[in-house]
């Protein structure tokens, strides 16, 4: 992997780490300069910016007594295409979110894909766009306050 590949993959993993820690404000800061597509199939697509994403997460993600959503986001199969000259990149990856609440079972609650775009600004890679795709949806009742049409 090139340096760009590693730095971009680290952005994917940092998102998962911050979300699982319940550090929503730090997590949303990863998208400070990005457009986030929540529903690409809607007409027009549902798109939010950093502040809209924070408002959504704050109202939607259940934070449990330990200060976390009690989740583990596993991000895998990142397929990256980096254009070093243009200082842009795309990445298609998959995610599966596991959750365990109280004495309940550890279970997958949702799985899907992230379709990301990145740009290099002042020598650092950052998200410029993220599209969420939910492919498989389980019991989200302990993770989200509503299903948002999932």
Task: Label each PLM-derived region with a short phrase.
Residues 24-95:
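A solvent-exposed, acidic/Ser-Thr-rich amphipathic alpha-helical stretch
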Residues 14-17, 59, 117:
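Alpha-helical scaffold segments in carbohydrate-active enzymes
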Residues 3, 45-48, 106:
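A structural signal for alpha-helical segments
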Residues 1-30:
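Short, low-complexity N-terminal intrinsically disordered segments enriched in polar/charged residues
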Residues 63-150:
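A beta-strand edge to alpha-helix "cap/lid" segment located at domain peripheries
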């Amino acid at each position: 992997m090139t340096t760009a590949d590693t730095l971009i993959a680290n952005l994917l993993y940092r998102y998962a780490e911050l979300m699982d820690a319940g550090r929503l404000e730090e997590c949303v800061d990863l998208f400070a300069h990005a457009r986030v597509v929540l529903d690409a199939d809607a007409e027009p697509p549902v798109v939010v910016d950093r502040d809209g994403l924070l408002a959504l997460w704050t109202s939607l993600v259940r934070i449990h007594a330990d200060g976390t959503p009690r989740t583990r986001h596993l991000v895998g199969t990142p397929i990256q295409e980096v254009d070093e000259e243009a200082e842009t990149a795309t990445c298609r990856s998959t995610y599966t979110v596991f959750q365990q609440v109280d004495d309940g079972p550890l279970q997958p609650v949702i799985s899907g894909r992230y379709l990301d775009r990145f740009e290099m600004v002042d020598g650092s890679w950052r998200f410029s766009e993220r599209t969420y795709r939910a492919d498989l949806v389980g019991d989200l009742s302990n993770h989200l306050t509503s299903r948002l049409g999932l």
